[in-house]
Amino acid sequence: FNTYIYNNTIFTKESILSKIAVDKASNGVLVANNIFYIEGESKHVLGDQYKPDKGGSVEIENTIFQNNLFLKNSYWPKNALIQPSKSLFGNATFRNTGGEKISDYVPLNTKLIKDRGIVINKIPNDSIGLDGGFKVEFDILGNKITDIPDLGAIELN
């Protein structure tokens, strides 16, 4: 199966260890236009944590992992099975970092976020795509997405 992870805003506070797992059986992965605001450390762990694979290296075919914003360039473990490319680094400067409401995660650093997304297309060799298509009309707060998407889950207007 193909996995599409795009236009999300992911926040974890400094006291949380972020665990990164990519199953060796993966084939067809797209991770793009996300904001990874991870204040603490991260660690690579083996596959599905309920049934961890035995580890080892393998190339995950049909992978697109690009155009994501990371708070710091040391976030993604170097031994993870997929590695980001064409990444951006910097502080999204959320309205209320650590808050409990979605609106707390409106990015204020517009220069880093606005219109910096890429258009999402099918993963190579994906004959189906997504049932509803790839273009998202509205963000999580109901803001209309126009032209080039922004990074993260919230469209800046």
What are these regions (language model features)?
Residues 1-2, 6, 11, 15, ...:
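Long hydrophobic segments that form regular secondary structure
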Residues 16-19, 42-43:
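Structural detector of coil-to-beta-strand junctions
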Residues 27-32, 37-157:
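Acidic, glycine- and Ser/Thr-rich low-complexity intrinsically disordered tracts
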